[in-house]
């Protein structure tokens, strides 16, 4: 009844403006529930996808910290004044953090004191280095960009080294690893340069101390990935110092008893 009256007396633009203002007020009462926040702001992280429950599990301990949160892909494509649902959601969920958004389209209308917008490509190393150089090391990076396998891998190779120590890197919509149109494959589940082939390969590095490979040279990922969590279409990668030793192996050789 109320919705019908509002639509009767207000233009679509006014309805949209009213909804945005009231959603912010309603969101304050649901600040600790990402599923509700996603629905309030219209983010596809709950409903179209089922990511909010996993984000809550990993992010809840960080909720009241002061952080730099960087999300690639703002949404709305080239439609004017469209997109930004998840940026608003993160700004509410992390009340002490600054939320940074990257998109190839102009999304400057979303800029606020706590939401910062940058226009450029996620595959442009100079652009990404410039953004991080300006804002400092992100504590959380979320890749919700083009989802093309090549772009996802290029972005990770550029940004993971720039992620803060003990930071979290998230890749959404990993189903494109199986889609040929996006550079993936369902026939070869170990296709070279498939994004999940790459991320699965990094799991062995968690146990580099156990390799029986004398002279083995550690990669950056061996040294700095401390855990990985795989969900339906979603991967979390934790950064830290992966320097736990083995109880049997020394310098990649078995220690004789």
Where are these regions (language model features)?
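A short alpha-helical cap/connector motif
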Residues: 1-142, 146-171, 175-257
């Amino acid at each position: 009844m109320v919705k019908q009256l509002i639509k009767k007396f207000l233009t679509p633009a006014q309805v949209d403006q009213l909804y945005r203002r009231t959603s912010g007020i309603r969101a304050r009462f649901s600040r600790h529930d990402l599923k509700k926040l996603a629905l309030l702001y219209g983010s596809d992280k709950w409903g179209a996808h089922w990511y909010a429950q996993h984000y809550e599990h990993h992010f809840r301990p960080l909720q009241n910290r002061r952080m730099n949160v960087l999300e690639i892909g703002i949404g709305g494509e080239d439609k004017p004044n469209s997109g930004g649902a998840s940026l608003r959601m993160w700004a509410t969920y992390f009340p002490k953090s600054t939320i940074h958004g990257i998109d190839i389209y102009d999304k400057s209308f979303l800029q606020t004191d706590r939401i910062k917008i940058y226009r450029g490509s996620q595959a442009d190393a100079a652009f990404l280095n410039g953004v991080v150089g300006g804002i400092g090391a992100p504590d959380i990076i979320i890749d919700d960009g083009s989802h093309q396998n090549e772009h996802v891998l290029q972005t990770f190779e550029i940004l993971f080294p720039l992620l803060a120590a003990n930071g979290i890197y998230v890749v959404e919509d990993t189903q494109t690893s199986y889609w040929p149109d996006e550079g993936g494959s369902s026939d070869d589940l170990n296709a070279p340069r498939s994004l999940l082939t790459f991320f699965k390969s990094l799991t062995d590095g968690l146990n580099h101390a156990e390799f029986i490979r004398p002279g083995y040279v550690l990669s950056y990922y061996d040294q700095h990935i401390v855990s990985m969590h795989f969900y339906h279409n979603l991967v979390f990668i934790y950064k830290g110092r992966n320097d736990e030793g083995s109880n049997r192996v020394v310098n990649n050789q078995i220690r004789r008893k």
